[in-house]
Amino acid sequence: LTEEVREKRGLSYSVYSQFAPGLNAGAFAISLQTRPDQAAEALKVSRQVLERFVADGPTEAELQAAKDNLIGGFALRIDSNRKLLGNVVNIATNGLPLDYLDGWTDRIAALTVADVRAAMARKLQPQRMVTVVLGAQP
């Protein structure tokens, strides 16, 4: 997203996506801020990037960078009582084993491109997504 929306086209200063998985479909969002006259193009490019990513999945290099980021930042996910409680809620809500956090980094390290592609195909269906745009009319 950053490469296509920000770097190549200059449509937004920042663009990011996030997925909040759960027992059901979960929520996926792409967020960006852009000028009203660029909103349609930014939305179009974002959708194209998402559809391509769901179809092709990440490259080995992209997956390794994501894994390095997640594993390297793991300590920051549990560095306060609030964050620990959030993890406990996640474990309870999703029926995960009590030792879920103990093996988290090992499970992330073991992920393959095929694993990610399969998960993307199961969880992300661009044709079923709802688009919400907030802002002024161009």
Where are these regions (language model features)?
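M16 family metallopeptidases and their MPP-like homologs
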Residues: 2-110, 127-135
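Bilobed periplasmic-binding protein-like "clamshell/Venus-flytrap" ligand-binding domains
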Residues: 115-133
